[in-house]
Design a protein with these regions (language model features):
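Residue-level detector of conserved, function-critical positions
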Residues: 1-367
Length: 367
C-alpha cells in the first residue's frame, strides 16, 4: 500500500515517483474550501515511500504523455499550471521532470517525438528535446509560434500573415506553406508552390511527396490528413462552401483530382454534394457520396478516387475514429437493418441489427 496525501483528488505516475493534486491546503479556511478548486489546490510529488520531493501551492498537474495520448511522449515530464493567489488566472505554465527535478518555464504545447514548444523570456519560441540525456536541450529558436514538428522539420505560424512556414532543420531551407493538417502521428503540409508532403511525426520519414498545382484565382484551401500518408485537398476559387477541385494524394505517388462534373451528372438533382474520405487499401482511396433515393431517403455510394462506384445504396458510409482506426479497406456502414463494419466487397466484418439494444451496453456513436 502506497502512502497518499490527505485530500488528494488526483494521482499521476511520473517515472518512479507519484504526483498528487491535493485539495484545500492548510491556508484555506473550512468555509472556503469549496469556493475555488485552483485557489485551494496544490501539487505534491513524492517517492513511493511517501518522501516529499516537490511541492507547489496554488497549482494543478497533468501528465504530458496522458494528456496528449502520444505513446512517444516521455512519461516522467509533468505539466505544472501555477495559479494566482486568488485562483483566477494561470501565472505560469512549466514542465517538470519528476525524475531529475528539472523545471522549464514557458511551456506552450507538446508537439511529437519527445519534443515540445516553449516561449522564452525574450518572446522567441523554442523547440526543446525532452528526451536528451541529463537535461532538456533547445534544438532551435523561431520568432513565430511553432505549430507542428516532425524529426528534421518544424512548422511555424506567421501571425501577421495568417499562413505558415516549413523549416528544414538540417539544411535551413524554408518553404512558404498555405495549409497544414495533423493526423495520427503524421504531419501534412501544402505549400504555396504546390508541394504537398506528409511526414511521419515519430521518425521524420516522408510518406508522401507530390505536387498539386494551385488553381487559378485560388482563395483558400482545406487540407485533411487522413493518416497513412493519405491527404484530401480541396481548393476554392470563391468564398462559398463549394470546392472548385478535390484531390486525393497518397503513398507511391498517388495524385488524383476527382471529376466533380461527372459525379454531379451521374446523380443529377439528387446529389447532395457530400463527398468524404472513408478508407484506403491497396494504393487506392475510397470516398462516400450522399444523394437522395426513393422516398427522399438519404443513400450513400462508396466510390474510388477515379469516381467509379464500388458499393451502392448504403444507408450510411463513413470512417471511424482516427485514434482507433479500422483495418485498411474496412469502414462503418449501414445496409438494410444491419449496421457494422463492412469491407470493400460489401461483406460484413462485424454487424448487428439496428434494433438491437441492451441497457448493459455502453452507448457509443456507432455501437
Amino acid at each position: 500500500e502506497l502512502p497518499v496525501p490527505e485530500n488528494a483528488y488526483t494521482c499521476v505516475a511520473a517515472g518512479d515517483r507519484l504526483a498528487f493534486g491535493i485539495y484545500a491546503p492548510g491556508d484555506a479556511a473550512p468555509d472556503e474550501e469549496n469556493d475555488d478548486l485552483y485557489q485551494y489546490s496544490a501539487v505534491q510529488i513524492q517517492e513511493r515511500d511517501g518522501t516529499v520531493v516537490y511541492r507547489n501551492d496554488h497549482a494543478a498537474v497533468l501528465s504530458v504523455a496522458l494528456s496528449n495520448g502520444d505513446a512517444s511522449a516521455p512519461t516522467d515530464w509533468l505539466e505544472i499550471d501555477t495559479y494566482s493567489d486568488d485562483g483566477s488566472s494561470i501565472e505560469q505554465t512549466s514542465l517538470l521532470n519528476a525524475t531529475t527535478g528539472e523545471e522549464r518555464s514557458g511551456f506552450v504545447v507538446y508537439l511529437s517525438a519527445g519534443v515540445a514548444s516553449f516561449q522564452s523570456e525574450n518572446g522567441t519560441y523554442q523547440l526543446v528535446d525532452l528526451t536528451s540525456t541529463g537535461q532538456s536541450e533547445v534544438l532551435c529558436e523561431f520568432e513565430d509560434p511553432i505549430s507542428a514538428y516532425a524529426p528534421g522539420v518544424a512548422v511555424t505560424y506567421r501571425q501577421d500573415l495568417g499562413d505558415y512556414e516549413l523549416h528544414d532543420l538540417n539544411t535551413g531551407d524554408v518553404l512558404e506553406v498555405r495549409d497544414e493538417s495533423l493526423g495520427t502521428n503524421t504531419l501534412a503540409v501544402y505549400a504555396k508552390d504546390g508541394t504537398l508532403r506528409v511526414y511521419d511525426q515519430n521518425t521524420g520519414a516522408v510518406l508522401t511527396d507530390t505536387v498539386v498545382t494551385p488553381i487559378e484565382g485560388l482563395q483558400r484551401t482545406d487540407l485533411y490528413n487522413v493518416d497513412g500518408g493519405w491527404v484530401w485537398l480541396r481548393q476554392y476559387d470563391n468564398d462559398d462552401y463549394e470546392a472548385t477541385t478535390r484531390t486525393v494524394c497518397g503513398p507511391n505517388g498517388t495524385n488524383k483530382t476527382l471529376d466533380l462534373d461527372a459525379i454531379k451528372a451521374r446523380y443529377g438533382a439528387d446529389f447532395h454534394g457530400y463527398l468524404w474520405p472513408v478508407t484506403a487499401a491497396g494504393g487506392e482511396f475510397y470516398f462516400s457520396v450522399s444523394y437522395q433515393g426513393p422516398g427522399r431517403n438519404w443513400l450513400y455510394d462508396l466510390i474510388d478516387s477515379t469516381g467509379n462506384v464500388v458499393l451502392a445504396g448504403l444507408g450510411s458510409c463513413n470512417g471511424y475514429y482516427a485514434a482507433n482506426p479500422l483495418p485498411d479497406g474496412v469502414f462503418v456502414a449501414r445496409k438494410g437493418f444491419e449496421i457494422g463494419w463492412m469491407d470493400l466487397h460489401g461483406q460484413w466484418v462485424y454487424c448487428q441489427n439496428i434494433f438491437y439494444s441492451s441497457g448493459d451496453d455502453a452507448e457509443n456513436y456507432y455501437f
